[in-house]
Amino acid sequence: MKNIMILSGAGLSAPSGLKTFRDNDGLWEEYDVMEVCSATGFRKNPKKVLDFYDARRVQLQNVKPNHAHEKIAQLKEKWGKNLFVITQNVDDLLERAGCKDVVHLHGFLPELRCLKCEGIFNIGYEKIIDKQCPKCKSKDLRHNIVMFEEQAPAYATLYSLLNQTSLFISIGTSGAVLPVGRYASMCEKSILNIYEKDANLERYFDKIYIEDIINAIDKIALDIENFMKDGNV
């Protein structure tokens, strides 16, 4: 049986109410991106960065998975090991929708990482203050998020799985961080879902849905069915 990859970005979780860098309101407007999302910013002002991620956890607690998260969870249940679910998002909405084995390329917001023993543990939506590592009891902790200027270990997993993928599906990502057009060209067939037209990106894909993922996801599910039957989308 052939393998499918769904790679998602901010456009997957935006309908749930999670703000992105491109929004003009909400959490992000108060911050300079490089101050709170870069290794340099963390070295300069760790408290500001940790406070920022505390605020993001609070925001995450107050939103729910949307229909697209739930549909992807159903697709994963149906296709199992033949469907790779990869996301640039750091939220837990796919997991809350019941999706198993999600690969988070840029880390996971509910988790902290110990700077002493490198242990990773889940604190849900709580603040980092007064937390300690369950392994070594250290309080020298940070968010388990890959910031700008840091290595993303999960990229190795992404590229390994891409080499096994026949149908590549890109959902809600502009290609600004990852070259999804190049990924599409590595696979037999490809589907793109974006909210606004982008001719430079569209040219790499076989099928394109320029619409909200809530409207597109059921069509994409049908495309997967067709691909698994006869290799076409």
Curated annotation (Swiss-Prot):
The active site is at residue 106. The gene is cobB. Substrate binds at residues 53, 56. The keyword ATP-binding does not apply. The keyword Methyltransferase does not apply. It is found in: Cytoplasm. It comes from Campylobacter jejuni (strain RM1221). Belongs to the sirtuin family. Class III subfamily. GO terms for cellular component: cytoplasm. NAD(+) binds at residues 9-28, 88-91, 172-174, 213. HAMAP family: Sirtuin_ClassIII (MF_01121). Zn(2+) binds at residues 114, 117, 133, 136. This is NAD-dependent protein deacylase. It catalyses: N(6)-acetyl-L-lysyl-[protein] + NAD(+) + H2O = 2''-O-acetyl-ADP-D-ribose + nicotinamide + L-lysyl-[protein]; N(6)-succinyl-L-lysyl-[protein] + NAD(+) + H2O = 2''-O-succinyl-ADP-D-ribose + nicotinamide + L-lysyl-[protein]. Its EC number is 2.3.1.286. It comes from the Bacteria. Its main location: cytoplasm. It holds the Pfam family SIR2. Residues 1-230 form the Deacetylase sirtuin-type domain.
